[in-house]
Amino acid sequence: MSTVRSEKEAVVAEIRGKIESASAVIITEYRGLTVQNLAALRGQLRGLGTEYRVYKNTMCRFAAREAGIEGLDDLFVGPTAIAFVDGDLAASAKTLKDFAKTNPLLVLRGGAVSNKVVSAEYIQV
């Protein structure tokens, strides 16, 4: 097996582990946000027990399927970041929603709560 393939499999396993251990995952589009904006958002979420990461969409699709969550494939298009929520889902969702109000380039796409796919509207409530 090639080194590149084994590295990709390791990344997929890492993402799958994060999905399986998180109480929820929130998928966002960050097109046009600056590095400073993303760093500020990561800092806010980190304080709530949420990790906000950018991964390749293809690897996220594989990891979600391996974690047993079907229906997220359509959300992994374009510049995508994932919030892995280990803390309070409501507080993390509110932080993302409030950040999106002041930074309209951040778009909440949807996610999964307890391995069930949810819409962006569900997360924004």
Kindly give the residue locations of the regions a language model identified.
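Positively charged, polar, low-complexity stretches
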Residues: 1-112, 117
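Phosphate-binding/catalytic loops
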Residues: 120-125
